[in-house]
């Protein structure tokens, strides 16, 4: 029969466990893990942290850019509103100036019309005075003529009245 060690060897050769090999493999595996941790895992984790920081910074930068864009948009909207208000004020000022100028033109035209009216009235008055003067001259000459005819012939009161009325009618026709 077989001894116990033979059975272990047979078991190991058939698929059993070989403890000394396993311990050596475990030792080397732990060394491999330590080396991987030091040379691979550490740099890999530092790269991952670096990448995480980079992404976080990019997100923060994007947020800042978005905030700046919003602020610029608000500023532009405020400027646009201010420009609109200024343009509206300029339009209102132009309307007011136009109304003022319109009133000044109307006032000037009225003053000119009043001046022309006064000049026309003065001309009419002068013509009236000349006509009255001419009429007075005519009446005076007729009065002299009547007086000379009266002197030439003595007339009755009726004849004198008739003569005066005739001369007045003549003066009225001469006008």
From Swiss-Prot:
One Pfam match, given by its short name, reads ATP-synt_B
What are the TM regions of this chain, as residue ranges? 22-44
Q: Which GO terms describe its molecular function?
A: proton-transporting ATP synthase activity, rotational mechanism; proton-transporting ATPase activity, rotational mechanism
Task: Note whether DNA repair occurs among the keywords.
Answer: no
UniProt subcellular location = Cell membrane
**Keywords tagged on the record:** ATP synthesis, Cell membrane, CF(0), Hydrogen ion transport, Ion transport, Membrane, Transmembrane, Transmembrane helix, Transport
Q: Which GO terms describe its cellular component?
A: plasma membrane; proton-transporting ATP synthase complex
Stated membrane topology is: Single-pass membrane protein
Provide the assembly information: F-type ATPases have 2 components, F(1) - the catalytic core - and F(0) - the membrane proton channel. F(1) has five subunits: alpha(3), beta(3), gamma(1), delta(1), epsilon(1). F(0) has three main subunits: a(1), b(2) and c(10-14). The alpha and beta chains form an alternating ring which encloses part of the gamma chain. F(1) is attached to F(0) by a central stalk formed by the gamma and epsilon chains, while a peripheral stalk is formed by the delta and b chains.
The task this protein performs is described as: F(1)F(0) ATP synthase produces ATP from ADP in the presence of a proton or sodium gradient. F-type ATPases consist of two structural domains, F(1) containing the extramembraneous catalytic core and F(0) containing the membrane proton channel, linked together by a central stalk and a peripheral stalk. During catalysis, ATP synthesis in the catalytic domain of F(1) is coupled via a rotary mechanism of the central stalk subunits to proton translocation.
Protein name in UniProt? ATP synthase subunit b
Q: Which organism is it from?
A: Oceanobacillus iheyensis (strain DSM 14371 / CIP 107618 / JCM 11309 / KCTC 3954 / HTE831)
């Amino acid at each position: 029969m077989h001894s116990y060690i033979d059975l272990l060897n047979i078991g190991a050769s058939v698929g059993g466990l070989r403890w000394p090999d396993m311990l050596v493999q475990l030792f080397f595996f732990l060394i491999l893990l330590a080396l991987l941790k030091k040379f691979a895992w550490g740099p890999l984790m530092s790269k991952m942290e670096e990448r995480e920081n980079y992404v976080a910074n990019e997100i923060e930068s994007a947020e800042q850019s978005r905030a700046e864009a919003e602020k610029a948009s608000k500023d532009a909207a405020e400027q646009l509103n201010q420009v609109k208000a200024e343009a509206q004020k300029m339009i209102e000022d132009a309307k007011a100036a136009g109304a003022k100028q319109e009133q000044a033109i109307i006032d000037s035209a009225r003053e000119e019309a009043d001046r022309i009216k006064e000049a026309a009235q003065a001309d009419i008055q002068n013509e009236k005075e000349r006509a009255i003067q001419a009429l007075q001259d005519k009446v005076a000459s007729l009065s002299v003529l009547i007086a000379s005819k009266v002197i030439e012939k003595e007339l009755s009161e009726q004849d004198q009245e008739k003569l005066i009325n005739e001369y007045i009618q003549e003066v009225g026709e001469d006008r």
